[in-house]
């Protein structure tokens, strides 16, 4: 059997035939060609493509075929080793990369650990300082309590003394060398006429009495203002001299309200009405009594 190029194909086995046709299918013009003419006889003969000559030689010489097999096996072994080395190198690179990351993390951990140790030491020192301070505070509290106990005792004596001094200052002040700055306490009866409210308005509350606390120097202007609001007002009680007219009225008002004898227009007001059963004469007697009681020295 001959090929298209005239080569005998009778001794070519099936795998080699496949190889031959695979080479033919590649883009080479000729795989096997003959040179028969020409002046140079040394060039005459059959020429084969380099990819095919090795197989032809292997067909012709078993020893050569073994040699080719060894070379091929060695080549494949080297390629396998190269691939394995590449894979190992890749893994080694990955290991190196991970090692660098681990080293970096370890450095950070070590740094954080050192910081935490430092902070722990500081906290221990602060705790010890707080314990010392707590002990000091307890000692100070003990001393403070002792001082408070003593000061409370002294304060009690001081309050009692101050109460007596205050009473003397308020109630036993001698007459001033300047009468114009002395106080007067006056109770006025207003005698106001009820005012009919306008449509839609509530009736205005009428108070029958007014307490005036005035200084002699301003008595005229104070009375003028009073009579402007209460044209028909009249004086029912005058205490010509009292060291503190405001204090006197507050004391009178407090007692009379508590005894349900008067109704005041407000806590800071001087206008009031008498309760049922309580007369004008009783009012004057009570005010004089309270004024005289204030002049007595407390025990």
UniProtKB/Swiss-Prot annotation:
Protein's UniProt keywords contain Oxidoreductase: no
Species of the source: Acanthamoeba polyphaga mimivirus
Q: Detail the disulphide connectivity of this chain as listed in its UniProt entry.
A: none
Q: Which UniProt keywords apply?
A: Coiled coil
Q: Which InterPro entries match?
A: DUF3627 (IPR022549), KilA/APSES_HTH (IPR018004), KilA_N (IPR017880)
The protein here is known as Putative KilA-N domain-containing protein R879
Please indicate if the UniProt record lists Ubl conjugation as a keyword: no
**Coiled coil region boundaries:** 76-150
- What are the residue boundaries of the KilA-N domain, all occurrences included? 1-75
């Amino acid at each position: 059997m001959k090929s298209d190029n005239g080569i005998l194909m009778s001794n070519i086995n099936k795998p080699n035939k496949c190889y031959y046709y695979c080479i033919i299918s590649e883009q080479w013009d000729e795989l096997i060609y003959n040179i028969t003419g020409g002046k140079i006889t040394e060039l005459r003969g059959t020429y084969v493509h380099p990819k095919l000559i090795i197989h032809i030689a292997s067909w012709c010489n078993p020893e050569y075929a073994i040699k080719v097999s060894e070379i091929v096996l060695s080549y494949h072994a080297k390629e396998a080793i190269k691939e394995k080395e590449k894979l190992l190198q890749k893994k080694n690179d990955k290991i190196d990369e991970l090692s660098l990351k681990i080293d970096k993390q370890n450095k950070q951990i070590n740094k954080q650990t050192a910081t935490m140790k430092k902070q722990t030491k500081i906290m221990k020192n602060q705790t010890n300082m707080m314990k010392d301070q707590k002990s000091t505070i307890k000692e100070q509290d003990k001393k403070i309590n002792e001082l408070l106990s003593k000061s409370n005792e002294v304060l009690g004596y001081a309050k009692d003394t101050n109460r007596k001094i205050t009473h003397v200052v308020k109630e036993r002040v001698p007459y001033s060398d300047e009468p114009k700055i002395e106080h007067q306490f006056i109770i006025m009866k207003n005698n106001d006429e009820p005012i009919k409210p306008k449509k839609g308005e509530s009736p205005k509350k009428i108070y029958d009495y007014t307490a005036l606390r005035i200084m002699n120097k301003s008595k005229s202007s104070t009375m003028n203002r009073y009579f402007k609001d209460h044209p028909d007002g009249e004086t029912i009680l005058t205490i010509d001299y009292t060291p503190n007219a405001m204090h006197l009225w507050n004391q009178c008002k407090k007692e009379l309200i508590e005894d349900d004898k008067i109704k005041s227009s407000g806590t800071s007001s001087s206008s009031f009405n008498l309760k049922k059963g309580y007369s004008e004469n009783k009012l004057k007697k009570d005010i004089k009594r309270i004024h005289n009681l204030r002049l007595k020295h407390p025990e």
